[in-house]
Amino acid sequence: MCDEFIHPGLVSDSRLSRRRFGLMTAAAAGTAGSALAQSNAASTEVTVKTPDGACDAVLFHPNSKGPSSKEKWPAVLIWPDIMGLRPAFRDMGARLASQGYTVLVVNPFYRSAHAPVIGDNFDFSNPEARARLTGYRAAMTNDGIDRDAAAYLAFLDVQAVTDKGKKAGVQGYCMGGALAFRSAAAVAGRIGGVGSFHGGNGLVTDKPDSPHLLIAKTNAAYLVCQAQNDDASNPKVKDDLKAAFAAAGKTATVEVYAANHGWCVPGGAVYNQAEAERAWSNLGALYKANLI
């Protein structure tokens, strides 16, 4: 759920500067900072061909021991939130890769614009700015998302640093939570773990294409981390999710965190470090148990 009520005054702040953000987070005690994560992860700007065009994205993997290294790691696809691929998500991709994964962070709006799709003065409470992003999202049909997910996993699987013998993961933030659910169904043979972070009420709708109705078609374990203000607006979502997981016989954790929609993304107006770190820890446990 991404609207002006859930995202009051959400703007692009100075921490969208890669250098400044890295220095700030690296200095935070007890936090795996951006600078540290990037020192342990290699990144490459890539273009992923899809049936609908060409997606700009960033590929991350742990720094190998040298050009002759034959190390391989499980693949993970990251769907950003409605503000798209930007420095915060690059840093999150690097952090995950440093933990032993080959990670692809995509521009979900490639059909409409090259990333980044927001500037330093972006304000989500501005109706015109918000309408531009929702227009980008509207260009992503369900069939298109399914095609994208298949293309992204195929791209990951041809990388020399991807361990195709292990299941892949997919995680999404805000609108990306629903996209992660769709991806798990579209590439059911590959996805073993799904993470949704402040996916909001878009995970359960009254429409026939509701993401929660896809759960039975997947072969994954789930971690669903809901925001407290999303839950307050519709407390029934968590219960419907739990019921859907139980009916499908899927392993799943559904929890409401003590933080607001968007809390996992560093640099955001509602970033909550303590709850974000807890989400990282739970994601690590999900992938360790299921990307095997």
Feature map (PLM): residue ranges:
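Short beta-strand/loop motif that positions the catalytic acidic residue
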Residues: 218, 224-226
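Gly/Ser-rich "nucleophile elbow"/oxyanion-hole loop immediately N-terminal to the catalytic nucleophile
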Residues: 121-169
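C-terminal catalytic histidine-bearing segment of alpha/beta-hydrolase fold enzymes
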Residues: 248-292
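N-terminal secretory signal peptides
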Residues: 1-16
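N-terminal export leaders
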Residues: 16-29
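Primarily recognizes the serine-hydrolase "nucleophile elbow" in alpha/beta-hydrolase
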Residues: 149-211
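N-terminal cap/lid segment of alpha/beta-hydrolase-fold proteins
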Residues: 35-68
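Short beta-strand element of the alpha/beta-hydrolase
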Residues: 70-81
